[in-house]
Amino acid sequence: MFRNFKVVSRVVFGRGCFNQLDDILSGKRKATDSFMVFLMDDVFKNSALEERLPLKDQDLLLWVNVDDEPKTAYVDELTQDVRTYIQSGLERLPDGVIGIGGGSTMDLAKAVALMLTNPGSSADYQGWDLINNPAIYHVAIPTLSGTGAEVSRTTVLTGPEKKLGINSDYTVFDQIVLDPDLTSGAPADQRFYTGMDCYIHCVESLTGTFLNAFSQSYGEKAMDLCREVFLEHGPDSNGKLMMASYFGGMSIAYSQVGICHALSYGLSFVLDLHHGIGNCIAFDYLEEFYPEGVREFREMMEKHGIKLPRGLVSGMGSNDLDKMIDVALVLDPLWENALGPDWKKIMTRDKIRELYQKM
C-alpha cells in the first residue's frame, strides 16, 4: 500500500511576503468578534517584527520560550492559556493559530492547534496517528531554516517518559509563509546547527531503505542547496537554506530519517539538548554508517569554525544511559529506514551504548 500523505495546502515564498499575512488571515476570520492566536518566540519581544504583526483587537499574542526543547507540559500550559482566554467571554475557538519562530515554536503552534480540538494531555498523543479530530487552522512563519517543521506531519515533543512526536496528517500546517528576510538575524552557530538538521535529513533519506523517486528528487535538491549554502556560501544563502529546509522536509515526508535522529532523541531527552546540536553531536560519530555524509559534514564544520562539545556522556550514570537507549529504541521506523527490517540484529542495546559512550 502506497502512502497517501497530506502536504501543506498553501505556500507563499519571497522576500517581504510576511507583509501579506494580514490578507491571508483576513480570509479565515469568520466573524467580527472572532480571534486568532499568535505564538511568537520571545526573542522577538519589542522587535520590529513584533510591530509588523497584523493583530486585531481580540487576537491573543502568546510569547513562547524555547530555550529548552518543547515539552508536553508546556503545550498543555499554552493550550490552557487559550482556553482561559476563551472562557473570559469569547466562548468560541480561535479561527487560527499562527507560529512565528524556529522549529520549536512551529512545533508548539502545531501542538496547540491540535490540542484545542482533542481532549486530554498532549503526552497522550505521542506516537503515530493517535489524533482523532482535525486541528484548528494553523500557519507557520519560520524565522530559522533547517528543521523542516514547516512541512512535516510531526510536532516533536519531550514528554514525561519519552521524546516522540505527535505524528498525524492533522499536524500538517494549512499555510506557510516563507520570507527569507525573517531569517537574516539568526546567530551564526544556531543557523549552522539548524541547517545541519536539514543536511542530515537529506543524508538519512537518500541512504535509507525507504528511498523512492519522490523522496530522492526532493532530497537531492535539498542536499545541493545545503552544499551551496555551507560550502560555497554564494548569494541569497538565506533563500536557498529556506528552500533546502522545505525540500528536505518533503523528502523525509515520503521516506524517513535514520540513525542520527534516533540517537539524537535520546541525547535531547536526557541532556536537554536542542535538536539541531544534538543531531550534530550524534552525526559526528556515525562514520561507520554514513561515511560520505560525515566527511562532508566535518568539512562544513571546519569552514564555519564550529566546535562541538565533547565528553557529554563519559561521566553519565548507568540509569541515564539506559534511558537514552530506551528513548532511541522506540523509534522503529527510523531504524528500519536506516538498516532494514532486521535492524534489531544490527543495532543492539550494546551497540547503541557503544555509540553513546563516544559522545
Give the ranges of each region predicted by the language model.
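C-terminal charged capping/lid subdomain of soluble metabolic enzymes
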Residues: 6, 298-359
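ATP/NTP phosphate-donor binding region
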Residues: 1-96
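Glycine-rich phosphate/pyrophosphate-binding beta-alpha loops
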Residues: 146, 250-274, 279
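Active-site pocket-lining segment
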Residues: 265-318, 322
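Carboxylate- and glycine-rich phosphate/diphosphate-binding segment that chelates Mg2+/Mn2+
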Residues: 154-254
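Glycine/threonine-rich beta-strand-loop-alpha-helix active-site module
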Residues: 73-80, 85-181
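Short glycine/serine/threonine-rich phosphate/pyrophosphate-binding segments
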Residues: 18-21, 45-48, 104-110, 148-151, ...
